[in-house]
Amino acid sequence: LNDDSGSDSSDKNDRLLTDEEKDAIGEIANISMGTAATTLFSLVNRRVEISTPVVSFSNWDDIVASYEKPCVFIKIAYTVGLDGSNILVLKERDVKVITDLMMGGDGTNTDEELGELHLSAISEAMNQMMGSAATSLSSMLNKTIDISPPVADIVDLKETVDEGQIDEFLTGEFVKISFRMEIGDLVDSEIMQLYPIPFAKEMCQGVSKNMELDSESITEDSKPISGNNAAASQTNTSSAQQPNMGAMNMGQSGQQPMMGQPMMG
């Protein structure tokens, strides 16, 4: 019996993420959501701030016990570059506020019942937000990433829900990434992203591999040059540095949404 339990424990550890992988997932989510925040700002014309993510492990019972009821589950499936899906969870009121703002309202029309119009609007918002996040992910993984149109559903966690019908990975343990989201003075709330653990590992491995390739490229570029190639290499080096400077500037602007900088509302 002891041997079996030890084996189970080892198997469980293999299924979970290491601390390094959790950090990597947090950084991936941070950059992706930063890009998504910029897109949401353009849709609602209000200041959008999304906080640094908190990465943890969770299961369906934890979600039912801790999150507001009812809520909206938005499934994002990857069609190119990654194999899998993740789920974004928003509170019902937040969906109503975003939908009202998208339709030209002031964000206070939240009394009516959540219906197909809200779900259609939030699906379109998430299509644009997660599409821009996929573009950021493409840069991090150095390959094309694409998604299918997100599908939004109302889920009342007070009722008995077959989580397997929402997505099979919800029947076991999964990665939960929590963000604080602020939209002007209308929303100060928590949103969640739920990832299957194998999918999270795949993203981490992709980022690590891309970083290794970048490191090898830098090492090759930094090798000493001798002979008559010195002058030519000096010219090449100075021109090669220009894109790097541009990339740094792009990185700085890319970080702005994470800090809530796109403030024109």
Name these PLM-found stretches:
Residues 1-2, 244:
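Intrinsically disordered, compositionally biased charged tails
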Residues 3-14, 18-233:
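Composition-driven recognition of glycine/serine/threonine/acidic- and proline-rich low-complexity segments
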Residues 212-265:
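Intrinsically disordered, low-complexity repeat regions enriched in Pro/Gln/Gly/Tyr
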